[in-house]
Amino acid sequence: MSLLIGYFLGSIPSAYLVTRRLTGRDIRQMGGGNMGGLNTFREVGVGAGAAVVLMDLAKGALAVSVAYYLLIQNAQWVILTGFAAVIGHNWPIWLDFKGGKGLGPAFGAMLFLLPVYGLPQHLLILALLVFIPLAITRNIALATGIALFSLPFLVWYGSHSEFATLISVLLFLMIGIKFVLDNRKNLRDPANRRNLIVDHWKRPDKNS
């Protein structure tokens, strides 16, 4: 039950709904085609992008909150529910299983999981691992990738839980593989490969 709830909450297509409501267009046909906050920010606007980010974070946080408080699941099932929310975001049943990369619901779940299971300081470390690379590179994808890569080490150091560490590794691999698959055309071009590392956060000039 909790896994289904996690999947269906994660599969709510936030970027699609916000963009369709504001512009009447399909976010999958705009910009890079990704169903996430960054593409919405770049193609629709700051407010729309912020709304999508908050909604995606909420999907992950709500999924694990329901499993923890309402269904009273043990830690393993709560963690798996958060993982299911990321799967739902990446492969939503409502849009032919074509979704985003899972960063929003993943970090949303961690906003709940880390403090609840006694690792609030690791949440601060994770935030620093996002914001410091972001300040240097201006690339939210690279910054969150660094944080996700570090997550298994943080989880193991803080909890020594083999299960939680394994899920952290699988989360990093799933999001990383989804990123590579969704950007395989760009990765073939040296100029585009550079853009995936620097200046990825900048919103394009619509007049250029």
From Swiss-Prot:
Query: Could you tell me where this protein is found in the cell?
Result: Cell membrane
Which Enzyme Commission numbers does its entry carry? 2.3.1.275
What's its catalytic activity? Answer: an acyl phosphate + sn-glycerol 3-phosphate = a 1-acyl-sn-glycero-3-phosphate + phosphate
HAMAP family per record? PlsY
The Gene Ontology biological process terms listed for this entry are: phospholipid biosynthetic process
UniProtKB keywords: Cell membrane, Lipid biosynthesis, Lipid metabolism, Membrane, Phospholipid biosynthesis, Phospholipid metabolism, Transferase, Transmembrane, Transmembrane helix
Q: Which Gene Ontology MF annotations are present?
A: acyl-phosphate glycerol-3-phosphate acyltransferase activity
Name the pathway: Lipid metabolism; phospholipid metabolism
Q: Which family does it belong to?
A: Belongs to the PlsY family.
List the transmembrane segments: 52-72, 77-97, 112-132, 140-160, 161-181
Protein's recorded name: Glycerol-3-phosphate acyltransferase 1
Q: How does it assemble?
A: Probably interacts with PlsX.
Looking at the keywords, is Membrane present?
yes
Q: Name one GO cellular component term.
A: plasma membrane
The record lists the organism as Dehalococcoides mccartyi (strain ATCC BAA-2266 / KCTC 15142 / 195) (Dehalococcoides ethenogenes (strain 195))
